[in-house]
Each structure stands twice: as structure tokens, then as C-alpha cells.
Amino acid sequence: MRGHPSLLLLYMALTTCLDTSPSEETDQEVFLGPPEAQSFLSSHTRIPRANHWDLELLTPGNLERECLEERCSWEEAREYFEDNTLTERFWESYIYNGKGGRGRVDVASLAVGLTGGILLIVLAGLGAFWYLRWRQHRGQQPCPQEAGLISPLSPLNPLGPPTPLPPPPPPPPGLPTYEQALAASGVHDAPPPPYTSLRRPH
């Protein structure tokens, strides 16, 4: 038989599910009666789940788990003690009873706050350091207007008398006139080569 094995499995599953023939299990009831249900809940063969997923009906209350490891309300404490006088006595000494008092330190919040504070201080210190370095670097560079007045050879001494600057060099001469250019002899004043060699014979 050729084909996909998944189609064969799907066919077998559908034929099994759609089977309407009477079976022996149809005579059994789904729900248990009160005696059987109580014996199931109180049997020692069943493994307790230790109050996982809020199964408080199956496991007894625990004061340390419900009120000391986490905050509990008056009703939760009453469920544990099952007596109003014992509950009131406990509630007066409970630190989260709503009447104030000093509670325990939340370590996670303290760690997050301290880490954030230290990080903020480090970032502020780095920002101040970079700003001071930028100002120091900017203070060492002269302004463009002052750059022409300060000679690189003169020492910068604000306390002493200013040293005189050397006189500026004379301006370069301008272009010569036409007559001056003709009268001047230069390298390129030679006559042009003769054109006899370039003529074609007729």
C-alpha cells in the first residue's frame, strides 16, 4: 500500500472515535458518590501536591507560608487559626496589619534602587568629566579673530609686557605693464624657429 503513514493514522483515529458500537464503559458513572469522594480525598495513597496551584482545600493551612513569607489578609489568618480570639491576638502583633509599624525590607526593591542610583552617579560623573575636558580643549584653541594677532613665535605671557611683533613683509609687486614686459629680457625671449623646414615642396 502506497501513501503517507500519517493519512493511515488519521483514518484509524477517526474510525476509532466515530465507533458507535456499545461498549462496557458506558455503564459506569462519571461522578463518584459522597462516601467514595470523601475516601478519595482522605486516602493516604494519593500524593499531596503541597498547595501547588492554589489547592488550599486539599492541604492544610500553614501560617509561615501564608502570612510570614508573603502578606496575608485578616480572613486568611482567620482561616488558619479558625478562632477569632487567636486571630485577633496574632493580628495585633502582625507587621502588615494595616495599623502601621515597621515591615521587613524588600531586598529586590532595595537592590534595584541602589543599582539605579550608582549607575546614575557614574553617568553623571562621566558626563561632568567629558564636559570639563571639552571646555579645557576649547579654551586652548584661540578664536579665529585672535589667531591673526598672536604670533606663534611670541610666548604667551599675560603677566609680562607684550613683545613687539615684527613688521609685516612688504606686499608682493603687482603685474608689470605692457611696456615693462617688452623691455624685460627673460628666458623665453628667443626668436621662434625658422619655418623653412616646415614648408612643403611644390
Curated annotation (Swiss-Prot):
Q: Which GO terms describe its molecular function?
A: calcium ion binding; serine-type endopeptidase activity
* Parts of the chain on the Extracellular side: 50-109
Q: Which residues form the propeptide?
A: 24-49
Q: Which domain of life is it from?
A: Eukaryota
Which residues are annotated with the PTM 4-carboxyglutamate? Answer: E70
Location in or out of the cell: Cell membrane
Q: Which Gene3D superfamilies does the entry mention? A: Coagulation Factor IX
Q: Which Pfam families match?
A: Gla
Which tissues express it? Widely expressed with highest levels in kidney. Also highly expressed in the thyroid.
Q: Where are the transmembrane segments?
A: 110-130
Protein keywords: Cell membrane, Disulfide bond, Gamma-carboxyglutamic acid, Membrane, Signal, Transmembrane, Transmembrane helix
The UniProt entry lists membrane topology as: Single-pass type I membrane protein
Instruction: Look up the record and report any one GO term of the cellular component aspect.
Output: extracellular space
Which parts of the sequence belong to the Gla domain? 50-96
**Could you read off the lineage of the organism from its UniProt record?**
Eukaryota, Metazoa, Chordata, Craniata, Vertebrata
| Main subcellular localisation | membrane
- Which residue stretches does the UniProt record annotate as biased composition, category Pro residues? 158-175
Record note on what altering Q180A does: Significantly impairs interaction with YAP1
| Spans annotated as Disordered | 143-202
Q: Which SUPFAM superfamilies match?
A: GLA-domain (SSF57630)
Question: Impact of changing E179A on the protein?
Answer: Significantly impairs interaction with YAP1
All ranges on the Cytoplasmic side of the membrane: 131-202
- Tell me where the signal peptide lies: 1-23
Q: How is it modified after translation?
A: Gamma-carboxyglutamate residues are formed by vitamin K dependent carboxylation. These residues are essential for the binding of calcium.
* Consequence when changing P173A: No effect on interaction with YAP1
Gene from which the chain derives: PRRG2
Q: What is this protein called?
A: Transmembrane gamma-carboxyglutamic acid protein 2
